[in-house]
């Protein structure tokens, strides 16, 4: 799954215990995420290996709606569509005429898109979180509490209260950088775009 296999302490936090600092960061992140009940944006994505060599560069558009609905469409020539209605995930590759269908893993550490669209009460259960804030930019570092994850470290940044970019680092040092632009929040979204109808002639793989 190319999109998903693929957020430092604030000055005041140094005067707090780790638990207090973490709680402040959880509250701040929840506050920012809760501002967007729906979100649409264009994105550009760059994947690098541990030495910094570029592996892949893609772009596309995304849409999110609480709770747990998301749609990520990667543009051609590496077109791919990832859709979830909150219960089921479809990963469609038109070039291969193939769709993989699976139940949505509700663990935030397995589905980073749920950080933006899922149950905010689960964030503190899944991650150790720190943050710093300066000049309208808020950077969060999220480290999974479980070892059974798709990434070791995730950075999520907001600019002027709007999500700006995300970086995921996996166990071998591979980095996936995602930049969001043209972000629009709290607009009415058609629920149909978070469902998927399998095109005729498409191979279906059920996982």
UniProtKB/Swiss-Prot annotation:
Nucleotide-binding among keywords: no
GO cellular component: outer membrane-bounded periplasmic space
GO BP, one annotated term: lipoprotein localization to outer membrane
Signal sequence region: 1-21
Pfam family, one: LolA
Keywords (A to Z) from UniProt: Chaperone, Periplasm, Protein transport, Signal, Transport
Record localization: Periplasm
UniProt xrefs under SUPFAM superfamilies: Prokaryotic lipoproteins and lipoprotein localization factors
Similarity annotation: Belongs to the LolA family.
Assembly information from the UniProt record: Monomer.
Entry protein name: Outer-membrane lipoprotein carrier protein
Native species: Azotobacter vinelandii (strain DJ / ATCC BAA-1303)
Organism classification: Bacteria, Pseudomonadati, Pseudomonadota, Gammaproteobacteria, Pseudomonadales
Gene that this polypeptide is encoded by: lolA
């Amino acid at each position: 799954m190319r999109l998903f296999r693929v957020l430092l302490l604030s000055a005041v936090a140094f005067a707090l215990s780790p638990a207090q600092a973490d709680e402040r960061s959880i509250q701040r992140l929840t506050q920012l995420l809760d501002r967007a009940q729906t979100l649409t944006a264009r994105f550009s994505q760059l994947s690098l290996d541990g030495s910094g060599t570029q592996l892949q560069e893609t772009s596309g558009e995304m849409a999110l709606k609480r709770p747990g609905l998301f749609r990520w469409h990667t543009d051609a020539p590496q077109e791919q569509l990832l859709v979830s209605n909150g219960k089921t995930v479809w990963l469609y590759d038109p070039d291969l005429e193939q769709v993989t269908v699976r139940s949505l893993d509700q663990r935030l550490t397995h589905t980073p898109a749920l950080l933006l669209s899922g149950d905010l009460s689960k964030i503190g259960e899944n991650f150790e979180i720190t943050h710093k804030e300066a000049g309208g930019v808020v950077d969060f570092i999220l480290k999974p509490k479980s070892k059974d994850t798709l990434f070791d470290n995730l950075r999520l940044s907001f600019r002027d209260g709007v999500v700006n970019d995300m970086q995921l680092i996996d166990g071998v040092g591979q980095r996936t950088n995602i930049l969001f632009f043209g972000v629009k929040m709290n607009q009415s979204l058609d629920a149909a775009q978070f469902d998927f109808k399998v095109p005729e002639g498409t191979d279906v793989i059920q996982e």
